[in-house]
């Protein structure tokens, strides 16, 4: 089977690939473009002053033909988990990385980590595989294997430079998300962990739309204890409920500071309104646990090492492992 490295052209101008061969756009898409494949193409507010309006209105509409292909490609994955946060900076991607390391520590599990933070990908750096490339064969795209039983996929692997910016609007993001779901050869996985950007944006709407038929186990929501983070988490939970996404539970990250020397713990971000646990009781969702802040987590993330393996006795490690057990119980895996 022949393979070749995925070219950076894949991430340069992908919009045209979602159009039928006989159509072409006259101008770049405007901000808030619903995408030429959308039911709202040519009808949305953003379309009214767009030069492509007539083209998009004339495109054939109907069920997305890629969704059955996505469902088939993901049929070998037992559990699909979205990692969400209402606000950036709460450690969502860091927790996604630690969750992936923790699950793959079980040699009997096959794990995939998919980075959907398209404009700010960070999983490859934290997993220690930034120098790897994605290969394409006649069966599809091969993800990068961090370990024998841990595969990763990110746009970062396809960028010409580590610090290259991805300046895309919704429809370009949608195309890449489709490719990650339809064309990546994930094979049989026990878990696919999906890291998403903060908030409720195009990526969240698209991943839910494209994966709904294949079955999403649910969302793991990450927050920090202070009220300003909880305010946005409430919006994230509201989004999940309106979108029909099951909420597996909430993790309170950075709930205290652990001194690496004395192992003493002190509060950095005070839970002024009761923190994540109180929020879970109020909203009737499962509280998966609290994870304290250990400064060595940042160092391990920077160096692409597993904090759980490097510091197995840290209170943060023990807390993460407890959360993983609660999560596995929530999806019926233990």
UniProtKB/Swiss-Prot annotation:
Gene3D superfamilies, from UniProt? P-loop containing nucleotide triphosphate hydrolases
Cite the InterPro entries for this sequence: Mrp-like_CS, Mrp/NBP35_ATP-bd, NUBP1/Nbp35, P-loop_NTPase, YlxH/NBP35
- Keywords linked to the UniProt accession: 4Fe-4S, ATP-binding, Cytoplasm, Iron, Iron-sulfur, Metal-binding, Nucleotide-binding, Nucleus
**Residues annotated as binding ATP:** 86-93
Q: Does the keyword Disulfide bond apply?
A: no
Q: Tell me the CDD domains matching this sequence.
A: Mrp_NBP35 (cd02037)
> What does the record's cofactor remark say about binding?
Binds 4 [4Fe-4S] clusters per heterotetramer. Contains two stable clusters in the N-termini of NBP35 and two labile, bridging clusters between subunits of the NBP35-CFD1 heterotetramer.
Q: What does this protein do, in the record's words?
A: Component of the cytosolic iron-sulfur (Fe/S) protein assembly (CIA) machinery. Required for maturation of extramitochondrial Fe-S proteins. The NBP35-CFD1 heterotetramer forms a Fe-S scaffold complex, mediating the de novo assembly of an Fe-S cluster and its transfer to target apoproteins. Required for biogenesis and export of both ribosomal subunits, which may reflect a role in assembly of the Fe/S clusters in RLI1, a protein which performs rRNA processing and ribosome export.
Q: What is this protein called?
A: Cytosolic Fe-S cluster assembly factor NBP35
